[in-house]
Regions:
Chain B
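N-terminal non-globular leader segments, chiefly Sec-dependent signal peptides
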Residues: 1-48
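Short, compact, well-ordered microdomains
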Residues: 46-63
Length: 292, 63
């Protein structure tokens, strides 16, 4: 077993480093909790370990050990469940909700990161079996792939964001030409006129029209703006809750929200960086719709 | 964001003859100012939102 000790250690190290690279505390403020960090780092370590010992097990023809890889996958499904549950619990106390599809996307990301770590460790060990330096180079290549190729698309890739005027026609609130809702109180109308910002998101093509129509994606946009730019809102104020409405004719989305920071350049920058949820991506253009 | 159930919890009106009794209490007021004040009070108490049906009538809707 001594011959494989060094490759396994290199594999584990690179796998663990990959997990640390993927675990970043960003503006979405998750995972900020020290306990959450420990959970993910230890899971990362375990998956790096499993990935690293797979190759020596194959080389030694120890097939029982290899089947344990399959067992490990079941364990990592638990990670997804754990993330989903804790995020859902937190979401009930959020002023502007994340929404179930956003949570599902995050939970999926946490699960898939463990597989990435496992894969990194596996490839690194495979290279390191041949020579120490090939192992190190292989590990670095894997880190680069993991870090730069695994980020999803952003809203700016599929749509254009522009500022829109908030106006009232009698009691009816409009963002540009899209009807948002009816507001009954003079006082609320004043607050909205003073604090609210409107934005119109115009999809770039037919696919993005369908993607943006997804309610989960729209809720994700609102949550994103609210977490980063704050919101002028409290519980028990349904009249001020941010809303999105869709122009059913051409698929444009109107956003109505009351941020603390009203500079539209910042708002546009934030909206451009809204992640496109995996569950929102639809590609009707790819489907065969011919009459055969 | 999902489809929510909405319910009228109160009606505030200056023209009671235009509103028929139903599940919600009807508050009769005399002028625009009282209309706004009553709507606001009920809105805050019920954590609901006020909506305008016409110049004389507001409804308070809870979701």
């Amino acid at each position: 077993m001594g011959t494989y000790l060094l490759p396994v250690i290199i594999g584990i190290t690179f796998g663990f480093v990959a997990r640390m690279l993927l675990l970043r505390t960003d503006f979405r403020q998750y995972p900020t909790y020290p306990t959450g960090r420990i959970i993910h780092l230890s899971f990362g370590f375990i998956s790096a370990f499993i990935g690293a010992v797979a190759i020596p097990a194959v080389l030694e023809s120890d097939w029982t050990a290899v089947t344990f890889l399959g067992l490990a996958a079941t364990q990592f499904r638990e990670v997804r469940k754990m993330e989903r549950e804790s995020l859902e619990n937190i979401d009930t106390f959020e002023l502007v909700k994340r929404g179930a599809p956003f949570i599902e996307g995050m939970a999926q990301a946490f699960e898939s990161r463990n597989y990435l770590v496992m894969f990194t460790a596996l490839i690194t060990t495979l290279c390191a079996v041949f020579s120490f330096w090939i192992g190190v180079i292989g590990g670095i290549v894997m880190l680069v792939i993991v870090k730069f190729n695994m980020s999803g698309k952003f809203l700016s890739d599929i749509a254009d964001v522009k500022e829109a005027e908030i106006r009232f026609e009698g009691p009816t609130l409009f963002v540009d030409d899209i009807l948002i809702k009816n507001v009954g109180l003079e006082d609320t109308r004043k607050t909205i006129t003073k604090q609210a910002v409107g934005a119109i998101v115009t999809p770039k093509n037919q696919n993005s029209i369908v993607t943006l129509s997804f309610l989960g994606q729209r809720q994700a946009m609102l949550h994103h703006v609210a977490t980063i730019l704050g919101s002028y809102l409290d519980s028990g104020e349904p009249a001020l809750i941010p809303l999105t409405k869709r122009d059913m004719a051409d698929g444009r989305i109107a956003l109505f929200f009351l941020p603390r920071e009203k500079d539209f350049n910042q708002i546009r920058a934030v909206l451009d960086k809204v992640p496109i949820l995996d569950s929102a991506i639809r590609m009707p253009k790819e489907a065969d719709k011919s009459n055969s | 964001m999902e489809n929510q159930h909405a319910e009228i919890v109160a009606v505030i009106t200056m023209k009671p003859e235009t509103v028929q009794g139903g599940g919600a209490p009807v508050f009769v007021v005399v002028d625009e100012m009282e209309l706004q004040e009553t709507s606001m009070t009920i809105e805050k108490i019920m954590d609901a939102s006020a909506h305008e049906i016409n110049k004389e009538t507001r409804i308070i809707v809870a979701r």
